[in-house]
Amino acid sequence: MATFSEEQEALVNSSWEAFSQNIPQLSIIFYTSILEKAPEAKAMFSFLKDSDGVPKDNLDLEAHCEKVFELTRNSALQLRAKGKVEVERIALKFLGYVHAQRRVLDPHFLVLKEALLKTLKEAMGDKWSEEVSNAWGIAYDELAGVIKKGMS
């Protein structure tokens, strides 16, 4: 169980605001970063499978990116409020099933975390800090742990 401070929650919320201001551009940075580190991941995303590179103006891509960041932010809020991340049973089964079907492995979770942090750093510019990185990293790690449990 991770402890999450009020300051960490505030950092996640303020950086979420920076991210949500420019989802179309930041989603391209996010998926480009994923594919640079793990080109095989392209086949895991239906909206990337049949494209060369990362398509611009792709609503499915943008929605998925926003969902990843939103789930991670919600994990931070839960960590602060409850001391743990909880996902509804139906949602957990779905997340676990989808990730298992796509053959997501532990290294893929790490690649996604690195892409998430890189994207947030881009969104925040000079307001980025190690503290912001740590707060999002904790929230993401807890969420990934819950999804991995749902995969088994």
From Swiss-Prot:
Modified residues (Nitrated tyrosine): Y31, Y140
Induction: Induced by polyamines (PA), abscisic acid (ABA) and gibberellic acid (GA), but repressed by ethylene and cytokinins (CK, an equimolar mixture of kinetin and 6-benzyl-aminopurine) in nodules. Induced by abscisic acid (ABA) in roots.
Residues binding heme b, per UniProt: S46, K67, H99, R102
Residue positions binding O2: H64
Iron recorded as keyword: yes
Description of the deletion phenotype: Smaller plants (shoots and roots), reduced number of leaves and nodules. Delayed growth associated with altered leaves metabolome linked to amino-acids processing, hormonal balance (increased accumulation of salicylic acid, but reduced methyl jasmonic acid levels), as well as fermentative and respiratory pathways.
UniProt xrefs under PROSITE patterns: GLOBIN
Modified residues (Phosphoserine): S46
Tissue-by-tissue expression: Mainly expressed in leaves and, at low levels, in roots of non-nodulated plants. However, accumulates also in nodules and roots, and, to a lower extent, in leaves, stems, flowers and fruits, in nodulated plants.
CDD domains cross-referenced by the UniProt entry: class1-2_nsHbs_Lbs
UniProt keywords, alphabetically: Heme, Iron, Metal-binding, Nitration, Nitrogen fixation, Oxygen transport, Phosphoprotein, Transport
GO BP of this protein: response to abscisic acid; response to cytokinin; response to jasmonic acid; response to polyamine macromolecule
InterPro entries the UniProt entry points to: Globin (IPR000971), Globin-like_sf (IPR009050), Globin/Proto (IPR012292), Leghaemoglobin-like (IPR001032)
PANTHER family noted in UniProt: LEGHEMOGLOBIN-RELATED, NON-SYMBIOTIC HEMOGLOBIN 2
Quaternary structure note: Monomer.
Functional note: Atypical leghemoglobin that reversibly binds oxygen O(2) through a pentacoordinated heme iron. In nodules, facilitates the diffusion of oxygen to the bacteroids while preventing the bacterial nitrogenase from being inactivated by buffering dioxygen, nitric oxide and carbon monoxide. This role is essential for symbiotic nitrogen fixation (SNF). Seems not restricted to symbiotic nitrogen fixation and root nodules formation, but also contributes to general plant development and metabolism.
Name the UniProt record assigns to this protein: Atypical leghemoglobin 2-1
